[in-house]
A protein has these predicted regions:
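Short, linear, compositionally biased motifs with a strong N-terminal bias
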Residues: 176, 180-181, 190-191, 198, ...
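N-terminal amphipathic/basic leader segments beginning at the initiator methionine
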Residues: 1-18
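Mg2+-dependent prenyl diphosphate-binding active-site environment of isoprenoid biosynthetic enzymes
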Residues: 15-160, 169, 196-276, 282-332
């Protein structure tokens, strides 16, 4: 995503902040993930957002590097056996496979710490920038989203028929997906409606609607489940995208209105990025996947809506948004 000039500036900054030292296993592990081939979307967003206000890339590159450190830390920890247990990352062995688990944990910790060391050294607006980043990656952001993701993995999010079945009792009843009144008002319809509602309540109390008891979820619940997946996407990914945009805006001296527009653009972009990822990864992993809940057509409609919102947010800015516009199009097309 970064143009070659900015990418080279980022590599120079990484080498300056984290010089190569083949005898230091921890530093080698940190550099291993940082210098692997990657899109660098988050650091790009810092630079591109600051460009809207005519800030030079070389003036924001240390902040962009700090954001990259945070992202790298999250990848290392996500790949650990206690998390996603992934053997590869960025077309190479994941950090704990290349080195070992203990080194991977420490490398992630060190990258996160280094990010805040860099940001605390800024001459201007450092507290504001640190606050925005902290909110995006803490319990209300990336880390909280990872916790939601892990705790949701035991749930089967695939679409189910309008039947609730409890394996341990053998009871099976078909529930109506909606209740419709067939009589005009004041003609006894209230009694029929009450009977229908009573039937549903009796059925729900009889059946044990918990996945641990072998339940199949009613199709009418899919909307709520999809919303939960979107919440995970928002917290794990979109909030750091948005923070990267807002931090670039802060560096550029944006107004509150401009900051909000860029933050919202980042949310739109991050949600598109994750939805596209769900489409591409559907055959490999159906867990916590929007495709499993909504189907491809509805997910694509969701992406189209987010794309339009992203364009609307960019239209509220008067500066050079070409880089951000191109990125929005590219992510919508390719993920």
């Amino acid at each position: 995503m970064l143009d070659e000039t900015t990418k080279n500036l980022l590599i120079v900054e990484v080498n300056k902040l984290l010089p190569e030292n083949s005898e230091n296993k921890l530093i080698s592990a940190m550099r291993y993930i940082l210098l692997a081939p990657a899109k660098h979307i988050r650091s790009f967003l810092v630079v591109a957002s600051s460009r809207v206000f005519n800030a030079e890339a070389k003036k924001v590159i240390s902040v962009a590097a700090a954001i990259e450190f945070v992202h790298a830390y999250s990848l290392i920890h996500d790949d650990l056996p206690c998390m996603d247990n992934s053997d590869t990352r960025r077309s190479q062995l994941s950090c704990h496979k290349k080195f070992d688990e203990a080194t991977a944990v420490l490398a992630g910790d060190a990258l996160l710490t280094l990010a805040f060391e860099v940001l605390s050294s800024l001459n201007e607006k450092r507290c504001e920038i640190i606050k925005v980043l902290s909110q995006a990656i803490g319990i209300r952001g990336m880390v909280g989203g990872q916790a939601l993701d892990i705790n949701s993995e035991h749930i089967d999010f695939s679409p189910q028929p309008s039947v609730i079945q409890v394996a341990d009792t053998g009871i099976q009843k078909a529930l109506p997906t909606s209740i419709s009144c067939k009589k005009p008002c004041n003609s006894g319809a209230e009694h029929e409606m009450d009977s229908s509602v009573s039937y549903l309540h009796d059925t729900l109390s009889t059946l044990k609607l918990q996945h641990s008891y072998g339940c199949m979820y009613d199709a009418g619940m899919t909307s709520g489940q999809a919303d939960k997946i979107k919440e995970i996407h928002l917290m794990k990914t979109a909030k750091l995208f948005a923070a990267s945009c807002e931090i670039g805006a802060i560096i550029g001296g944006a107004t509150d209105k401009q900051r909000k527009a860029l933050y919202n653009y980042g949310i739109n972009l991050g949600l598109i990025f994750q939805a596209k990822d769900d489409i591409e990864d559907y055959e490999q992993d159906k867990t916590n996947n929007l495709m499993s809940m909504l189907g491809k057509s509805e997910v694509e409609d969701y992406i189209d809506g987010l794309f339009k919102q992203g364009l609307d947010n960019l239209s509220a800015l008067s500066g050079d948004t070409n880089y951000l516009y191109d990125l929005l199009n590219q992510v919508k097309k390719d993920g």
